[in-house]
Amino acid sequence: PNDFGELIGQDTLVKTFYNSLNKGRLAHAFLLTGIRGVGKTTTARIIAKALNCIGDGTNTEPIFDICNICSTCISINKGNFLDVIEVDAASRTGVDGIREIIDAVMYSPNSGRYKVYIIDEVHMLSTSAVSSLLKNLEEPPEHVKFIFCTTEPRKIPATILSRCQRFDLKRIPFSTLAKFLQNIASKEGKEINVNA
């Protein structure tokens, strides 16, 4: 998926994010939970695009209908947009592993509207790493958004959980996936057998 319209099976997240965006009440930190492969990191990238998409150049606020053709969206899709920083907490568990984040949070975005930190497997961070990150969650700069992804929310300290808007991503039922694939095939002029 490249935008909220393609994010099937996650209707609660899509509707809540849409409403938050329209009311100008976006959280400064999001927690995406769910089983492996459910789309947490992909969803985080979609949120990052919504926060930074410039569309035809006139967008000055985050938008729900991501264009996927502006330079910002293209860079985020390619993984080389400087203001969307992805961190694998499983391989950087200690304070030193996230010091780069802690030190860089105070600086304004390079070209985006927001600096977005996507921290995958956040439950793997050590207690000291969480403590050092906490100050940024308690008093976040206006230009920073955090998106935490995890398969094990119960391992995340309450001090982090209480500062995030939480979305539990659901496993997509086979019937929903089959219908989605049939729609794609139909648009491409192809026919598929979902029972195969």
Language model region names:
Residues 1-166, 172-186, 194:
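P-loop/Walker A NTP-binding region and its immediately flanking N-terminal helices
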